């Protein structure tokens, strides 16, 4: 990634962001307009914390110590656009419901699964899914299920390792290589793994640049 692209994120991420909508089912989705970047991952993988760190607003996406708290598709956009006509934001960030919470009621899990699958299959403006993996645990069985779902939906996705401050720094390159090996033959996987720590602000600049490149926004 070039130095120019790595520093071009400021016009987009250097402004306030706002929450615009929680979507419990497909009929509540906003009209298709700006490109969408979605964040998926297991419960408590750090999705909300990562979104807050990306935009520099601690309270934007609600964080919780209770797994499975996010039960909707939560939409966030940069402030300063009317949302009407051509005055649309360049993109929207979407915080998806976490998966893999064993104590969640089955009907809730079924509803989340349907919402996520329908969204992945039927949203033309969805540009990429960033699948968050806890660096302490690596890719687990239900992560593999989501990878398969994304492959079947032909939805481009990229792996983002979270909480790298919780493991030894020397182990991060090895974990990246192990993760790359696991996704090497998956058709929809973007062949580059990002590593981040929301708490230590590690890897955020690279993730911002990757997102800007994905949506074609370079200032």
Swiss-Prot record:
Listed GO MF terms: GTP binding; metal ion binding
Residues binding GTP, per UniProt: 41-48, 68-72, 95-98, 162-165, 196-198
Co-factor requirement: Mg(2+)
GO biological process terms held by the UniProt record: division septum assembly
InterPro entries in the cross-refs: G_ENGB_dom (IPR030393), GTP-bd (IPR006073), GTP-bd_ribosome_bio_YsxC (IPR019987), P-loop_NTPase (IPR027417)
UniProt xrefs under Pfam families: MMR_HSR1
Sequence similarity: Belongs to the TRAFAC class TrmE-Era-EngA-EngB-Septin-like GTPase superfamily. EngB GTPase family.
HAMAP family: GTPase_EngB
Protein name, per record: Probable GTP-binding protein EngB
Organism: Allorhizobium ampelinum (strain ATCC BAA-846 / DSM 112012 / S4)
């Amino acid at each position: 990634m070039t130095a120019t692209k790595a520093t071009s994120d400021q016009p987009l991420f250097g402004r306030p962001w706002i929450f615009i909508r929680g979507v419990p089912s497909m009929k509540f989705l906003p009209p298709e307009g700006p490109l969408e970047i979605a964040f998926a991952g297991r419960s408590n993988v750090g999705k909300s914390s990562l979104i807050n760190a990306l935009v520099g607003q601690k309270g934007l996406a609600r964080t919780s110590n209770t797994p499975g708290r996010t039960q909707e598709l939560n939409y966030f956009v940069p402030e300063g656009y009317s949302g009407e006509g051509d005055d649309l934001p360049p993109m929207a960030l979407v915080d998806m419901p976490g998966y893999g919470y064993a104590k969640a009621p089955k009907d809730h899990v079924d509803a989340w699964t349907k919402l996520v699958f329908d969204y992945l299959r039927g949203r033309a403006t969805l540009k990429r899914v960033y699948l968050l993996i806890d660096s302490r645990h690596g890719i687990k069985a239900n992560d593999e299920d989501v990878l398969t779902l994304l492959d079947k939906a032909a939805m481009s996705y990229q792996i983002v390792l979270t909480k790298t401050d919780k493991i030894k720094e020397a182990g991060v390159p090895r974990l990246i290589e192990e993760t790359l090996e696991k996704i090497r033959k998956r058709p929809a996987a973007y062949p580059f793994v990002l590593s981040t720590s929301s708490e230590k602000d590690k890897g955020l600049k690279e993730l911002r640049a990757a997102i800007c490149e994905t949506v074609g926004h370079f200032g």
